[in-house]
UniProtKB/Swiss-Prot annotation:
This is Probable tRNA sulfurtransferase. GO terms for cellular component: cytosol. HAMAP family: ThiI (MF_00021). It catalyses: [ThiI sulfur-carrier protein]-S-sulfanyl-L-cysteine + a uridine in tRNA + 2 reduced [2Fe-2S]-[ferredoxin] + ATP + H(+) = [ThiI sulfur-carrier protein]-L-cysteine + a 4-thiouridine in tRNA + 2 oxidized [2Fe-2S]-[ferredoxin] + AMP + diphosphate; [ThiS sulfur-carrier protein]-C-terminal Gly-Gly-AMP + S-sulfanyl-L-cysteinyl-[cysteine desulfurase] + AH2 = [ThiS sulfur-carrier protein]-C-terminal-Gly-aminoethanethioate + L-cysteinyl-[cysteine desulfurase] + A + AMP + 2 H(+). Catalyzes the ATP-dependent transfer of a sulfur to tRNA to produce 4-thiouridine in position 8 of tRNAs, which functions as a near-UV photosensor. Also catalyzes the transfer of sulfur to the sulfur carrier protein ThiS, forming ThiS-thiocarboxylate. This is a step in the synthesis of thiazole, in the thiamine biosynthesis pathway. The sulfur is donated as persulfide by IscS. Signal peptide: none annotated. InterPro entries: Rossmann-like_a/b/a_fold, ThiI_AANH, ThiI_fer, ThiI_N, THUMP_dom, THUMP_ThiI, tRNA_STrfase, tRNA_sulfurtransferase_ThiI. Pathway: Cofactor biosynthesis; thiamine diphosphate biosynthesis. SMART domains: THUMP. GO terms for molecular function: ATP binding; CCA tRNA nucleotidyltransferase activity; tRNA binding; tRNA-uracil-4 sulfurtransferase activity.
C-alpha cells in the first residue's frame, strides 16, 4: 500500500536565491545514504522530495531518518486525482494505522494543486464523513471525530499529478544538509560531549573531520578503538568521516617535564588547539569544533577558554557551550553515542589531571608557565603531525 516516502526539508525552503544549492546537496546526501539499500526513483517538488522504493520501504526509512536536512518523512499511499480513489485509499490507510478501537481521528488536507475542484476544508469534511460511514457499523461507533486532540490524523496532500495519503510522520535530524556549510575539524575525545558537538555541527551543514589525541602507552589501544566506534556512529549521519589519530605522547611528556603541575590542563589544551589548527589549515577545514560547555570542568571556565583560544586564529565553534550535562547526555542517547562514551577507557585528558588545576588562568601567567616549553613547541607539533594516523571511517 505504501509506495512512496514523502520527505520534508524545513528551513531549506526559507533560503533565498541559493535554495537550489541546499536542495541539491540534500538530494546528493539522500542518494549517498541509500547506496546498497535497493532500487528506487526520486522526484522533487516545491517543499517536498519523494522517494519511490521498489521494495523494502522500511529499510529506506531507517536510512533516510538519519540524514541531516530532513525534518520528517512519511510512508505514503498514492492515488490518482479523483475523489473515489481518494476515498478508497483513505479508508485503507486509516484502517492500517489504527491498532486499537475505539479511536478518534481528524483529516487534514493540503491542496497544493489549485486546479483540483474541491477546496481543502471540503476534502477534509467529505473524506472524514466517508471514513465514519466505512468503518463504523449501525451498532458500534468505534470511530469518532476529534479535531482538537485526535489519536490519529489522516493527512492528504493534493499535488499536480497525484494525491498522497498518510498518517505517520517520522522525525529526521532537521537542520541543513551536511556539506552545505563547508568543512570543520572536530576535537573528538572518548567522552560524552564531543560526539554530540560533532552531531550538532553536522546539523548546521558542516562536513566533519575529526582529530583524536592518542597518548599510547598511557592510553590503551582500546581507548583508540572506542573513538573509532564513536566516529562510526557519527558517520551514520553523513557519507564518511576522516579521523586523524594524533600522536600526543611526546607533547604530554614535555608538558610534564617543563611546566608547573597546576597548568598541565591549560597548556595541554593550548597544544591541542595549535596542533588542530595546523591539521585543519592543511586540509581545508574552516573551523574547529569542540565539546566544551561553560563551567563544566576546569578548562571550560570563560577565563580558561579565553587563554586556550589565544593560540589559534581559527574560529572555534562550541555547540554545547550553554547546555548542562543532562541535556548533553539526553542528546548522546538520542544519537546513539552515549553507551560507547561511558565505557571505562581513559583518554589523554584524564590521565595527567593535576590534583588542583588552575581554573581561572591569566594569560601572562600561562605564558610564563609555558616558557620552558616555548623553544620545543614547533618541533613537537611537527613530529606529532608527521606521526598522526589517518583513518577513513564509514558506518556499516
Amino acid at each position: 500500500m505504501y509506495k512512496v516516502i514523502l520527505i520534508r526539508y524545513g528551513e531549506i525552503a526559507l533560503k533565498g536565491q541559493n535554495r537550489h544549492v541546499f536542495i541539491n546537496k540534500l538530494i546528493e546526501n539522500i542518494k549517498e545514504s541509500l547506496k546498497g539499500v535497493g532500487e528506487y526513483k526520486l522526484k522533487k517538488t516545491l517543499g517536498r522530495i519523494y522517494v519511490f522504493p521498489n521494495d523494502n520501504i522500511n529499510q529506506f526509512i531507517e536510512k533516510l531518518k538519519m540524514v541531516p536536512g530532513i525534518v520528517s518523512l512519511s510512508p505514503t499511499a498514492v492515488c490518482p486525482l479523483d475523489f473515489d480513489s481518494l476515498k478508497e485509499t483513505s479508508v485503507k490507510v486509516l484502517k492500517d494505522a489504527i491498532n486499537d478501537y475505539p479511536a478518534t481521528f481528524k483529516v487534514e488536507t493540503r491542496r497544493a494543486n489549485k486546479q483540483f475542484p474541491y477546496k481543502s476544508p471540503e476534502v477534509s469534511r467529505e473524506i472524514g464523513a466517508h471514513l465514519l460511514r466505512s468503518i463504523n457499523t449501525p451498532d458500534h461507533n468505534i470511530l469518532t471525530v476529534d479535531v482538537h486532540n485526535p489519536r490519529y490524523t489522516l493527512k492528504i496532500e493534493i499535488r499536480k499529478k497525484n494525491i498522497y495519503v498518510f498518517t505517520r510522520s517520522i522525525s529526521g535530524p532537521g537542520g541543513l544538509p551536511v556539506g552545505s556549510s563547508g568543512k570543520g575539524l572536530l576535537l573528538l575525545s572518548g567522552g560524552i560531549d564531543s560526539p554530540v558537538a560533532g552531531w550538532l555541527a553536522m546539523k548546521r551543514g558542516i562536513e566533519l573531520e575529526a582529530l583524536y589525541f592518542h597518548s599510547f602507552p598511557y592510553t590503551s589501544d582500546r581507548a583508540k578503538e572506542k573513538v573509532i566506534d564513536l566516529t562510526k556512529v557519527l558517520s551514520r549521519y553523513c557519507k564518511k568521516i576522516k579521523l586523524y589519530v594524533g600522536y600526543f605522547t611526546d607533547i604530554q611528556r614535555a608538558i610534564q617535564e617543563n611546566c608547573p603541575q597546576k597548568y598541565y590542563i591549560t597548556i595541554m589544551r593550548r597544544m591541542m588547539y595549535r596542533m588542530a589548527e595546523r591539521i585543519a589549515r592543511k586540509n581545508g577545514d574552516l573551523v574547529l569544533i569542540t565539546g566544551e560547555s561553560v563551567g563544566q570542568v576546569a578548562s571550560q571556565t570563560l577565563e580558561s577558554m579565553n587563554v586556550i583560544n589565544e593560540v589559534t586564529n581559527m574560529p572555534v565553534l562550541r555547540p554545547l557551550a550553554t547546555m548542562n550535562k543532562t541535556e548533553i547526555m539526553d542528546l548522546a542517547r538520542e544519537i546513539g553515542t552515549y553507551d560507547i562514551s561511558i565505557l571505562p577507557h581513559e583518554d589523554c585528558c584524564t590521565i595527567f589531571v593535576p590534583r588542583h588545576p588552575v581554573t581561572r588562568p591569566r594569560l601572562d601567567r600561562t605564558l610564563k608557565a609555558e616558557e620552558k616549553l616555548k623553544a620545543e613547541i614547533d618541533g613537537l607539533l611537527e613530529d606529532a603531525i608527521e606521526k598522526t594516523e589517518i583513518l577513513e571511517i564509514k558506518h556499516g
